[in-house]
Design a protein with these regions (language model features):
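N-proximal low-complexity "stem/linker" segments adjacent to membrane-targeting elements
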Residues: 1-23
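Short, acidic, metal-binding catalytic loop of nucleotide-sugar glycosyltransferases
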Residues: 22-31
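A conserved acidic beta->alpha catalytic loop
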Residues: 23, 38-47, 87
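Acidic donor-binding/catalytic loop of UDP-sugar-dependent glycosyltransferases
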Residues: 44, 90-103
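Glycine-rich, basic loop-to-helix element that forms the pyrophosphate-binding segment
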Residues: 62-78
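Flexible acidic/His/Gly-enriched loops in nucleotide-sugar-dependent glycosyltransferase catalytic domains
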Residues: 67, 97-164, 210, 216
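Short aromatic/hydrophobic "clamp" motif used to bind/position activated sugar donors
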Residues: 83
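Conserved nucleotide-sugar donor-binding catalytic segment
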Residues: 135-213
Length: 247
C-alpha cells in the first residue's frame, strides 16, 4: 500500500497532463501512485496512454461525466491512505509528496490539510502565493472565496469517501469550493506554508470561463447546494450572507 494516491482527472489536455506526470516522476519520495482519470477525452489522450507504461502510473478511461465524478471515481479505486486531487494542467515541485508525508506524521494523521502553492504564467513568471495560517482557512473560504488549490489539498481517504465532490455539471468549476466549505465546517483544515506546487494560469483553464449566464446559474446552484447541508448551515449561521456576496 502507498501512502498517497494522486488522482489526476483530465479532458483533452494531453499536452498539459504529460508535463504534470513528469513533475511527479521527479519526486524526492516514491511513496505514492498516480491515477490518470480520462474523462472521455476526444483528443489523442487514450491513444497515448495505451502504450504508456510506468509502474507509478495507471490510466483509467470513463464516459465524460465532469470533474466531480472523475475525482470521486479516482478516489474510489485509490490504494493510498490519503488522496490528493491534482489538476492535469499544473505542476508539482519535487518536494510535494515528501512534504505531505512529513506533515501527515507531524499532524498525527489529520483529516485534511493544505500545502502552499504559487501561481505562475504559462511562460514561467511567478504571480502570487497563498498567505494564510491554520486558524483562519475556514474564515478565508467564507470571506474571500475559494483560496485553496485542489492540487495542494491532502485528504484522508476515509474522509474523501464520506464527503465526495458534487457531481452535477451545474457546479462544474466550483465543486471543489463547495467541498472545502463543507469540510471546513466539520474538520480543521491545517495550513502548511511550504510551497509544493504550481497553478498554471492559462486561457484554457475551465475556471476561467467568462460566460456570465453560466456563472450566475453556477453560483445559484452552489448556494442551494450549501443550504441543503444542515450541518454546514448550523455552523456558518449568519455568515452565509457573506458567501452570497462572494458569489
Amino acid at each position: 500500500m502507498v501512502s498517497i494516491s494522486v488522482v489526476i482527472p483530465t479532458y483533452n489536455r494531453l499536452n498539459f497532463v504529460v508535463k504534470t506526470i513528469e513533475s511527479f516522476l521527479n519526486q524526492q519520495s516514491d511513496d505514492f501512485e498516480l491515477l490518470i482519470v480520462d474523462d472521455g477525452s476526444t483528443d489523442k489522450t487514450e491513444e497515448y496512454f495505451t502504450s504508456y507504461k510506468h509502474p507509478k502510473v495507471t490510466y483509467h478511461r470513463i464516459v465524460n461525466s465532469e470533474r466531480g465524478f472523475a475525482r470521486n471515481y479516482g478516489a474510489s479505486i485509490a490504494k493510498g491512505r490519503y488522496v490528493n486531487f491534482f489538476d492535469s494542467d499544473d505542476l508539482a515541485y519535487d518536494n510535494h509528496i515528501s512534504t505531505a508525508l512529513h506533515y501527515i506524521k507531524k499532524l498525527d494523521n489529520p483529516e485534511i490539510f493544505h500545502l502552499n502553492y504559487v501561481y505562475q504564467t504559462i511562460d514561467g513568471q511567478e504571480l502570487d502565493a497563498l498567505k494564510a495560517h491554520s486558524d483562519n482557512i475556514g474564515e478565508m473560504l467564507i470571506k474571500k472565496g475559494n483560496v485553496l488549490s485542489c492540487n495542494s489539498v491532502i485528504i484522508r481517504k476515509d474522509i474523501a469517501a464520506k464527503f465526495p465532490f458534487c457531481e452535477s455539471r451545474l457546479l462544474s468549476g466550483t465543486e471543489d469550493y463547495a467541498l472545502w466549505l463543507s469540510l471546513s465546517s466539520r474538520f480543521k483544515i491545517h495550513y502548511v506554508p511550504e510551497i509544493t506546487s504550481v497553478v498554471i494560469d492559462h486561457e484554457q483553464r475551465s475556471m476561467a470561463s467568462h460566460d456570465i449566464i453560466k456563472m450566475i446559474n453556477r453560483n445559484m446552484f452552489l448556494l442551494d447546494h450549501l443550504q441543503a447541508d444542515q450541518h454546514f448551515m448550523q455552523y456558518i449561521g449568519k455568515q452565509f450572507n457573506q458567501i452570497q456576496c462572494e458569489c
